[in-house]
Amino acid sequence: MAQTEKRVFFQFKGLKIEGLLCDSAGPKAVVVTHPHPLYGGDMYNNVVEAIVKAYRERNFTTLRINFRGVGNSEGGFDEGLGEQEDVKAALTYLQGLEKSFIDLAGYSFGAWVNAKGLKGYEQVNRVVMVSPPVNFIDFSFLDYNPKIKLVIAGSGDDIGPPQMIQKMLSKWNPDIRFEIIQGADHFYWGKTGEIEKIVGSFLDSEDTGY
């Protein structure tokens, strides 16, 4: 299993987008997106790290990205519109590496960006969302989509309250696996190990065919 990540750049309409790639053998891969850039979110976020670790330990190629305007990614914050294109560019980049089974995972704002663009992401097989910020950004656009498989929330999360998320699950996908981490707020300090375990358990229980 590949153990190290390398910095990569890929282009979208003239913008250079930065990512960290850990390339493992085989077709399985995941793109991981970060929380809100205007509140300090980037690809080095603790929750992003936990998601990446769970996937890497199961021999998935992982690609976490900095949205436009973050870190060494060019451009500027685009209210989630251009950020959807950043995700699409990342998915296309993985296809160029001959990855054919691609998951899409996001935390907070990253989960919202992923959901907004999901209908246009034909490459995506499964979607994982950690703390979709339903009390901060509108999610009414999100209709039934069987690709949404796992949602994680903290019991004390006021930005993605589990009670609000619970009411939306039947619309998103009645078969979603919904996990609540007790004692966690939106930032999961001291709780990222539990995120890692839940994502790992989900991956272990799902047959990818590879």
Q: Model regions: which residues?
A:
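Serine-hydrolase catalytic machinery in alpha/beta-hydrolase-like enzymes
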Residues: 10-12, 16-97
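Short beta-strand/loop motif that positions the catalytic acidic residue
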Residues: 145-146, 150-153, 157
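Gly/Ala-rich beta-loop-alpha elbow adjacent to hydrolase catalytic centers
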Residues: 106-114
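Catalytic histidine neighborhood in serine/cysteine hydrolases
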Residues: 171-187
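Active-site nucleophile loop of the alpha/beta-hydrolase fold
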Residues: 35-36, 129-137, 154
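Conserved alpha/beta-hydrolase fold motif
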Residues: 101-104, 127
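Catalytic histidine-centered segment of alpha/beta-hydrolase-like enzymes
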Residues: 75, 184-196
